[in-house]
Swiss-Prot record:
SUPFAM superfamilies xref list: YhbC-like, N-terminal domain
GO BP terms in the entry: ribosomal small subunit assembly; translation
Protein name as annotated: Ribosome maturation factor RimP
Cross-referenced InterPro entries: Ribosome_maturation_RimP, RimP_C, RimP_N, RimP_N_sf
Keywords, ordered alphabetically: Cytoplasm, Ribosome biogenesis
UniProt superkingdom: Bacteria
Length: 182
């Protein structure tokens, strides 16, 4: 698929979702944001994968609602019909835990969680660290701070270790993935 076509589809979806909201089980409205879009083609069909979220998470029911809405809008849009002249399959889902974080909004909702971050340090070395994500700085040079203190089983009378904090500018982050805790 051509990059310019993907960009047009992505821009159209961004505009479509810009004012969208979904409801949680309590009836509260949440603004939807587009995390990523992937378009794959084979000989007979285009597959459009839309990864959407809200600041409080997105449910399967929300994804079904979005899928129906986006599909109806794609079918009704002459612009999209020109970009998708053949059959397409639309898949709407949450980004899931295995996908890297790509937006500040995703970072905000994951404060307090364990993360694995791959970044390029000031010396140009690629490093990967695990730690608890404790803060997000959005002013000046945007960055995240992790507590990389090793979690050890507490021994009686053991003195707790002081936090070992690492701050990483967004410009150095190559990949940040939330880790599953058991």
């Amino acid at each position: 698929m051509m990059d310019s076509r993907l960009k047009l589809i992505q821009d159209w979806l961004l505009q479509l979702l810009a004012e969208m909201t979904v409801s949680d089980p309590d009836g509260n409205e949440h603004e939807v944001f587009l995390v990523d879009i992937e378009v794959h083609s084979n000989k007979t069909i285009d597959i459009i994968e839309v990864f959407a979220d809200t600041d409080s998470g997105i449910s399967v029911e929300n994804c079904k609602f979005l899928s129906k809405h986006i599909s109806a809008e794609l079918d009704a849009s002459e612009e999209m019909q020109a970009l998708l002249p053949r059959h397409f399959k639309l898949v709407v889902s949450s980004p899931g835990l295995s996908r890297p974080l790509t937006m500040n909004r995703q970072y905000k909702k994951n404060i307090g969680r364990l993360m694995q971050v791959t970044y390029q340090n000031a010396d140009g070395e690629i490093k990967t660290i695990d730690g608890r994500f404790i803060s997000l700085e959005e002013e000046a040079e945007a960055s995240i701070t992790l507590d990389i203190t090793k979690i050890q089983k507490s021994k009686p009378n053991a003195k707790p270790k002081p936090p070992e904090l690492v701050t990483i500018p967004f410009s150095q982050i190559q990949k940040a993935i939330v880790q599953v805790e058991f």
